[in-house]
Amino acid sequence: EPLPIDTLVAGLPSAFNDLSETGWFDAAQGILTTDTRAKGSSLQYGQDRPITITGIAKGSGMIKPNMATMLAYIATDAKIDNELLHRALRLACDKSFNRITVDSDTSTNDSVVLVATGASGVVIDEDTFESFVGHLTDIFIQLAQAIIRDGEGASKFVSVAIEGALDESEALQVAYTIAESP
């Protein structure tokens, strides 16, 4: 069935008028497919001038490997250059979305979008990068775990920890073998 472009275009003015800083829950509801609940997380850190990181996600099946049919949208008001933001995205994904599986099935599409508006005026540089990535990873993990908890047909949430592996690659191979066993 062709995408109804005219209908989409006609709805844009209304969609733009409905935009708000507090519309995250509405957005989380709007992206659901087979999910049973909206998934979102937000935090602020920093004393004098706090940084906010907020995200939403969808997904409940076909999650492995490396995200599969899940979508995640995360925004921060931190001011950070593109290179550092891209590095932060990779590091946070590698500890969260790229570590989950629901049914071992794969898909052809996945997305994690991370944007930084700079609205807080707080600059993230090499000195503050590690703290930023830690907080960003917390949000990513909360969203990834929410996807697992909403997994199609899932009745359990299991974390697998591997010790004594030669390297991270071997640990992941063992972990996925355990996680995907019948």
Enumerate the language-model features and the residues they cover.
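Flexible, glycine/charged-enriched surface loops at secondary-structure junctions
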Residues: 21-28, 97-109, 142-159
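Acidic, glycine-rich loop-and-beta core segments that form the ion-binding/anion-interacting portion
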Residues: 81-143
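Generic structural hydrophobic/aromatic packing signal, biased to beta-strands
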Residues: 31, 44, 74, 114-115, ...
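A glycine- and small/hydrophobic-rich beta-loop-beta segment
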Residues: 117-182
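Structured core elements
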Residues: 52-55, 73, 101, 113-114, ...
